[in-house]
C-alpha cells in the first residue's frame, strides 16, 4: 500500500498525551507539511500560530473549556503540550477550506513522525475576542483572521485507538 494512503487510513485522533514537548525540529516538519496543503487559487490564505509557551497554552485551554461549556478541570487539549492554531484570512474566499486542508496535513504529518494529534474546535470563537486579535497583532500578524482549529500535538501516552469500521452507503458512483 502507498505510504500516504496508509497514513491516511491509520491516523487516529489521540486523546491522551505525555507532557513532554515534541522536539522543535519535529514541530517544524509538521508545520512545513501544513504549509504545503492545497489552497484555492494559490493564495495560501491560511497561517499557523505555533504555541509552545505553556502559560499561553494553558490560557487557551481554559478559554476553550469555557467556550465549550466543559467542567472545571477538563483540559480540552487532552494534555498535549503543543498547539498549532490554524487561522484563515477573512478576505480570502477559500480561506476556511484552505485552513481545513492545512489542519489535515498537520495531523497526517504528526502521525508520520509517530506523534499524536487531534483537531480541537472553538478557535473561531477564541480569535473573535479582542485579546486574541491583539495577540496576533503583537506577533506581527496584520489583517482580519478567522480561527479554523487547533491541531494539538504531542507524544502519545498509551496505545492509539483502533479505527471504527467505515459506514456503508457513503460513496455514489455516476458512471
Task: List each model region and its residues.
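Acidic, surface-exposed loops and disordered segments
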Residues: 1-175
